[in-house]
Regions:
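Glycine-rich, phosphate-binding/catalytic loops in enzymes
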Residues: 94, 140, 156-158
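Beta-rich strand-turn-strand
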Residues: 56-60, 109-122, 128-132
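Domain-scale signature associated with acetyltransferase and cell-envelope carbohydrate enzymes
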Residues: 1-78, 101-103, 120, 136, ...
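A short, glycine- and basic residue-enriched loop/turn
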Residues: 98, 115-116, 137
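Conserved catalytic-core motifs of eukaryotic protein kinase domains, centered on the activation segment
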Residues: 81-82, 88-90, 150-151
Length: 201
């Protein structure tokens, strides 16, 4: 990631430890706080979150995102209309805070609109448009988003926070993956790839 592929406009914007932001030149991550009222407007993103390419979060009053929340490519979260319904000259329009609970997963290109609260562990399906509160421990999908399934409360839930909590264990996992991916590599194979590369090298 290059810093210029992440745009932060306005403030305050608070991002917790171990949050990963993935951005590309064609799919920038945009975090915007823009309020017309003095002292209003803030964005809080918890620890261990994941923001994938193209994520946009736009706050006119308040957006609070809990720990271990994952936002897939192109997800959009906003707490404002950004223009008045009848007075289009209003630059922000009506704003109502958005609160997203711990360990929520927001799917590809999903939209979360003003005034919404999403309960912990819930999953928002790809392309969903969330216009009403979503309870905890459910899967919601569609436009407007509706609950399509409840998660099993008896099954243990592992979060990004759990995964990132032990750096030594995490490093060992990555080392194991690297070794598995390179197990068929040989010195002669490397030399051949330099002299006579073939597709798949």
């Amino acid at each position: 990631m290059k810093p210029w592929d992440v745009e932060v406009f306005g403030g305050p914007v608070s991002i917790g430890a171990c949050t990963h932001v993935i951005a590309t030149p064609d799919k920038r991550v945009r975090l915007t706080v823009w309020s017309t009222l003095e002292g209003r407007g803030r964005m809080v993103i918890g620890k261990y979150c994941l923001l994938c390419p193209g994520v946009r979060i736009s706050a006119g009053c308040e957006i609070v995102i809990g720990d271990s929340v994952m936002m897939a490519q192109g997800a959009f979260i906003t707490d404002s209309d950004w223009h008045g319904v009848y007075d289009r000259s209003l630059s922000v329009g009506e704003s109502i805070p958005v609160h997203i609970g711990r360990n929520v997963w927001i799917g590809d290109s999903a939209i979360v609109t003003k005034g919404v609260a999403i309960g912990e562990n819930s999953i928002i399906g790809a392309g969903a448009v969330v216009v009403r509160d979503i309870p905890p421990n459910v899967i919601a999908a569609g436009n407007p988003a509706a609950v399509v399934r409840e998660l099993d409360p008896d099954r243990p839930m592992k979060t990004r926070g759990d995964w990132l909590a032990d750096p030594k264990e995490l490093a060992a996992q990555f080392e194991e993956i690297d070794l598995d991916r390179m197990k068929n590599n040989t010195w002669l194979g490397w030399l051949r790839s330099l002299i006579h590369p073939v597709k798949g090298d």
